[in-house]
Amino acid sequence: MAKEAYKRDKPHVNIGTIGHVDHGKTTLTAAITSVLAKAGNAEMREFGDIDKAPEERERGITISTAHVEYQTEKRHYAHIDCPGHADYIKNMITGAAQMDGAILVVAGTDGPMPQTREHILLARQVNVPALVVFLNKVDIADPELLELVELELRELLTEYDFPGDDIPIIKGSALKALEGDAEAEKAIMELMDAVDDYIPEPVRDVDKPFLMPVEDVFSISGRGTVGTGRIERGVVKINEEVELVGIKPTKKTVVTGIEMFQKILDQGQAGDNAGLLFRGVGKDEIERGMVVAKPGTITPHTKFKAEVYILKKEEGGRHTPFFNNYRPQFYFRTTDVTGAVTLPEGVEMVMPGDNLSIEVELIVPIAMDENLRFAIREGGRTVGAGTVTQIIE
């Protein structure tokens, strides 16, 4: 059978299900595919099929994630569901599956539980733009309890800086919908309408300001210095002014040539592997680990706060805890930089398998903005992963 061409007639959005263990995330994922399949907008995926999620490696960390796709009348969705709690934490912190929004699943029978809180906090820390809530198992919950659960949820969302009063909360039963109950199926359609309307359409990488991490540098005699790398976002054109940022002093220059696969282009865009030729840049002024960016859009920093996950021994991480002033390498985009870790007040040590907020001071500045992902390494071996949550200086 020939592969169907990917139609780009609808906006594409990445979402995922989050929430406490056994509250019905995977059942809901299966129910969405089953209800949308009836409308001809998805392929039905069985619960067991989603639950046996394949393992993937992202920044040296193994994560189990199930990928499902479906569409509504308005959009095309890629949906991720993780079987285990640790997989969620790793997924959100490494950005393995960058989410444009998430469906928070809460069982009406239990209300918010510890992992509910933890997932909301993580969603805030790693900047998931919007959440929609599915209050599940309402068929077996006490109606008076449901009202309390909804109030409690709105307070919890507000506590973590989400607009708790405005977030849509849809009540339903994922299991009943999966069994084909008409009322329950209606709630799933209502949920998808809320996701369509409430989760904002993401800005495409190509529409963001230009940025390319430098992977390699070489000189072409008589022509100048070339930096190569994969363009992360935006578009660059010949004769445009750019800045070289990070590690060394920031330098303005002009792109005098763009090459891709030995072809000369007049522009490069997000996703392209390109070589950029710079005017008046010496080979000693640019190196791997710097970025080329639209002037004024990114700045170099050494001190930041981050949310990190530290690998367990079984995951190939450290075998022992680390303490304040731990000095590993932080791998940003294309290079390792040594940094010192400051643990939060009252935390004496960090055990393999922990996730927490830390403060880091790097020995050289790196071009960064909030939300930048990194790996934590010791001698080239990954021992953790993180996301920049706040820049200090």
Curated annotation (Swiss-Prot):
Spell out the GO cellular component terms annotated for this protein, sorted alphabetically and separated by semicolons.
Answer: cytosol
Q: Which Gene Ontology MF annotations are present?
A: GTP binding; GTPase activity; translation elongation factor activity
Note one Pfam family from the annotation. GTP_EFTU_D3
Q: From the UniProt entry, list the residue stretches annotated as the region G4.
A: 136-139
Region G2: start and end of each range?
60-64
Q: Which reactions fall under this protein's catalytic activity?
A: GTP + H2O = GDP + phosphate + H(+)
**The tr-type G domain, residue ranges:** 10-203
Protein role = GTP hydrolase that promotes the GTP-dependent binding of aminoacyl-tRNA to the A-site of ribosomes during protein biosynthesis.
**What is the name of the protein in this document?**
Elongation factor Tu
